[in-house]
Regions:
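Active-site and ligand/interface coordination hotspots across diverse enzymes
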Residues: 1-76, 161-175, 200-216
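Short catalytic/ligand-binding loop motif for oxyanion handling, primarily in non-cytosolic enzymes
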Residues: 54-57, 114-115, 151-155, 188-191
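Residues at the C-termini of beta-strands that transition into short coil/loop
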Residues: 109, 183-186, 205
């Protein structure tokens, strides 16, 4: 059974007029998706978004806005059992599938905005520090941060490039936890496609042990 809050809209899509109400200072706009150790579930891959969009906050589901390529690319990579439509909320069956596979989802910053570039540099930096503080307890095998620009700001790594990072370059990053940066899957990112994102997810899933090298 999920411990996450149900969609504030009761399983329907938000209207355009409703979205503005979710642009609040609250730092817990959306609940994390995390495997439950009490159920014997192990966190292998922790996917970290930048921050929730307004649609995502409206339905309490990660990457929920239609047109976001996160869920289609995750499925194409073989990381979900079926295509996921989170536009009205995350189906408990899909959440359970992620947890069984050892996949968790969180954000650098919990405040919902219409666009990620509305966040301040200090919000991103504090979000980066907060993630580092959480890692000793969460203990994922691999962390994948979705967004190179936010990563550069959060961790003062202006020359960082997409792909596998050097964790030792991040102050306080726990030993033994791999770190990757993948492209932002938003439809606003013209440099990424569902296919290219799927390739990125396969790479990080192999690092985390979610997929095996001979997986299709």
């Amino acid at each position: 059974m999920s411990t996450r809050r149900p969609s504030p809209l009761g399983g329907r899509r938000p209207t355009r007029a409703e979205l503005a109400a979710f642009a609040t200072p609250a730092t817990d706009a959306i609940d994390d998706v995390l495997p439950d150790a009490a159920r014997g579930e192990e966190l292998r891959l922790l996917i970290v978004g930048i921050n929730p969009g307004l649609w995502t906050a409206a339905v309490n589901a990660p990457f929920a806005r239609p047109g976001n390529r996160f869920w289609p690319s995750l499925h194409r990579a073989g990381l979900t059992a079926r295509p996921v439509d989170a536009s009205t909320g995350l189906d408990p069956e899909d959440e359970a599938d992620l947890r069984r596979r050892g996949i968790g989802i969180t954000n650098l910053v919990g405040r919902a905005t219409a666009r990620a570039d509305e966040l301040t540099r200090e919000e991103l930096r504090e979000g980066g520090r907060a993630l580092v503080r959480r890692l000793p307890e969460l203990r994922p095998r691999t962390v994948a941060i979705a967004g190179i620009t936010a990563f550069r700001t959060a961790y003062s790594q202006p020359r960082a490039r997409l792909g596998r990072q050097v964790p030792a370059a991040i102050d306080g990053w726990p030993a033994g936890i791999a770190l990757h940066v993948v492209p932002q899957p938003s439809g606003l990112n013209a440099h990424a496609t569902v296919d290219s994102l799927a390739d990125d997810w396969r790479e990080v899933a192999l690092s985390a042990g979610v997929l095996r090298a001979n997986s299709d």
